């Protein structure tokens, strides 16, 4: 390790370097540093024919596909085998060695159907062309029959997920209890709406009238009274109502048919 890394040197921040001590302040750049990097020539622009070479059939190369000259002369592409030189070549008679001398015929409809239905469900025997289609089928249909269910210990209801079962159990245990009257609820927001009945707070007001409500659902039901569409109709007097509860109240109080 150099000594400069082991010895501490204390420099004064107020002391500035004296550049006049240098023999010369001129900077020299050697012209030989660029000799090591040769200049890359510009690419030569070729004509269109250089990029798109025409396809030329050389019949002299076809002799390499035959074992002897006699086989080449007997072939249909030999010039001596046919007098008509303008007759097109029949390339379907040749095949590669890997295919064993068989021509590549188009697939039959039976083989196409087998290829399209190669993924089969082992539960309902339905077939699919892709593995993704088979997986989606199992997830939506077949898995629902074999899927593990979670049963409630308070009633006979069953749920697919454990989270849904826990939310249902709250309707039996009622963990949210009002400290004023002792009434219990299954959800915190139900308890919060109940506490407003004790405090008298009604933060949800109607924009059409001066009525206010402690719960948003009550305000939503009240807004239907201002709607022009009243789809609940009394069968006796043909009077229409915006809510089913208002129709039931009308029928319980006694419907008076005007004669």
UniProtKB/Swiss-Prot annotation:
Subcellular localization, as worded in the UniProt entry: Nucleus
UniProtKB keywords: Developmental protein, DNA-binding, Metal-binding, Nucleus, Repeat, Ubl conjugation, Zinc, Zinc-finger
Main location: nucleus
Reported modifications of this chain: Ubiquitinated.
Span list, region SNAG domain: 1-20
Annotated segments matching region Disordered: 71-113
Zn finger limits (C2H2-type): 119-141, 150-172, 176-198, 204-226, 232-255
Tissue: Maternal expression is nearly completely restricted to the vegetal hemisphere. Zygotic expression begins in the dorsal marginal zone just before gastrulation (stage 9), and is almost completely absent in the animal hemisphere. At mid-gastrula (stage 11-11.5), expression begins in the ectoderm in an arc surrounding the prospective neural plate. From stage 12, anterior expression is down-regulated, while levels are increased in the prospective neural crest.
GO cellular component: nucleus
Induction (UniProt): By two classes of mesoderm inducing factors: transforming growth factor-beta (TGF-beta) family and fibroblast growth factor (FGF).
GO molecular function term, any single one: zinc ion binding
Superkingdom of this protein's organism: Eukaryota
GO biological process: negative regulation of DNA-templated transcription; negative regulation of transcription by RNA polymerase II; neural crest cell fate specification; neural crest cell migration; neural crest formation; regulation of DNA-templated transcription
Classification via InterPro entries: Snail/Krueppel_Znf, Znf_C2H2_sf, Znf_C2H2_type
Subunit structure and binding partners: Interacts (via SNAG domain) with limd1 (via LIM domains), wtip (via LIM domains) and ajuba (via LIM domains). Interacts with elp3; the interaction inhibits snai1 ubiquitination and promotes snai1 stability.
Homology family: Belongs to the snail C2H2-type zinc-finger protein family.
Function of the molecule: Transcriptional repressor. Acts upstream of snai2/slug, zic5 and other neural crest markers in the specification of the neural crest and neural crest migration. Involved in embryonic mesoderm formation.
Name of the protein in question: Protein snail homolog Sna
Source organism per UniProt: Xenopus laevis
């Amino acid at each position: 390790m150099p000594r400069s890394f082991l010895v501490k040197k204390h420099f004064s921040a107020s002391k500035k370097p004296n550049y006049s001590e240098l023999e010369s302040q001129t900077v020299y750049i050697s012209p030989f540093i660029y000799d090591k990097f040769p200049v890359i020539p510009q690419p030569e622009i070729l004509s269109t024919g250089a990029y798109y070479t025409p396809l030329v059939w050389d019949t002299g190369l076809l002799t390499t596909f035959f074992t002897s000259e006699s086989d080449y002369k007997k072939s249909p592409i030999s010039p001596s085998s046919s007098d008509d030189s303008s007759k097109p070549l029949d390339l379907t008679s040749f095949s590669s060695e890997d295919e064993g001398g068989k021509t590549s015929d188009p697939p039959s409809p039976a083989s196409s159907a087998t290829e399209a239905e190669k993924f089969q469900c082992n539960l309902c025997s339905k077939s699919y062309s892709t593995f993704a289609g088979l997986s989606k089928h199992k997830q939506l249909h077949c898995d629902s029959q074999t899927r593990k269910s979670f049963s409630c210990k308070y009633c006979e209801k069953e749920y697919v997920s454990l989270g849904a079962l826990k939310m249902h159990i709250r309707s039996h245990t009622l963990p949210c209890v009002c400290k004023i009257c002792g009434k219990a609820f299954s959800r915190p927001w139900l308890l919060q709406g109940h506490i407003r009945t004790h405090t008298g707070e009604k933060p949800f007001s109607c924009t059409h009238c001066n009525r206010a409500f402690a719960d948003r659902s009550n305000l939503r039901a009240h807004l239907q009274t201002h709607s022009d569409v009243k789809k609940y109709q009394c069968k006796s007097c043909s009077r229409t109502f915006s809510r089913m509860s208002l129709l039931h109240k009308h029928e319980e109080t006694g419907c008076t048919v005007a004669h």
